[in-house]
């Protein structure tokens, strides 16, 4: 699936206007960028970094904790509804990602 980034919560790895390719149902490891359903508003998707998996789901965090309007597991707790793992940022062409970008090592 394709997802467009909005907001500044994932800077510097992702910026508003970036387009991502997401593999639905892919295995997730700590450090991966993921797309999940926002708890309390399941029609809205969020892009966050998976930090750890516990008994109640994944703890998801924003890279930019100071972003206005940022919401992550610090606000709503662990998340069970992970839609998929970000595979790559495909647009815009030529922009390098931040040191914690989307490449998987």
Q: Model regions: which residues?
A:
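Extended hydrophobic leader/signal-anchor segments used for secretion and membrane insertion
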Residues: 1-105
